[in-house]
Amino acid sequence: TCVCGSDLWTYRNPNIKEGRLNSGHEAIGIVEETGDAITTVKPGDFVIAPFTHGCGECDACYAGFDGTCDRHLGNSNWSHGVQAEYIRFHCANWSLIKIPGQPSDYTEAMLKSLLSLADVMPTGYHAARVAHVKPGDKVVVIGDGAVGQCAVIAAKMCGASQIVLMSRYKDRQEMALASGATAVVEERGEEGIAKVREILGGGADAALECVGTEAAIDQALGVLHNGGRMGFVGVPHYNNRA
């Protein structure tokens, strides 16, 4: 498993006592036991355990939004506590993804890449998907963390002709440029919007918001031309979530 930025919110929360719960919501591992209804995986299988538990049968899952599965258990459909020796995974028939072979068949780098498919890469791809990024589109990615980096990769996979990353960190800029970004904008606010529009020769066809702040959402809306599309995957951390 790995540490997501959202795990740190819980870790740093003074209202949560130490030892009360495990962090983590994305993992790869070996199936130890299965329930009677499970037919798609068996003990010994190497699998990706994603951060959502879609049933694969409801309207939300059929529409490709398993994160809001109509049949989810508990208050949310996110995994919790996977930084543990064993975890219980609901809706395994549809949600667990079998990986060919065993962990020993892969290098450490390949295992880390597979782990990214449990959350961060699908989240970045989901931003591009819901924004309907298509070949030739001009795309802006707001957020240069792991999800933003994966959104850059996803936009390139979808055939975007220009990909502008809004970032202030040199190492993250270099990573994104190596992954397919065509330009970087460090400015924010109206200055940043003007810079993006200058680079693209107008507004963007799609904006992929990967931060979750009001400022980031305003930035995403500001860089779009009329009729542009926004993929919003940043976890909201502000009061107004309408």
What is each stretch, according to the model?
Residues A160, V211-A242:
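Glycine-rich phosphate-binding loop and adjacent beta-alpha segment
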Residues A127, A151-A154:
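Hydrophobic residues within alpha-helices
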Residues F46, K138, G228-R229:
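Short glycine-centered segments of the SAM/dcSAM-binding site in methyltransferase folds
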Residues V141-D144, Q149, K156-Q219:
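Adenosine-nucleotide cofactor-binding segment
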Residues T1, R12-D59, P100-T107:
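Glycine-rich beta-strand-centered segment in the early N-terminal region that forms part
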Residues S6-R12:
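Cytochrome P450 core scaffold surrounding the K-helix E-X-X-R motif
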Residues C55-I142:
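NAD(P)H dinucleotide-binding glycine-rich loop of Rossmann-like/cofactor-binding domains
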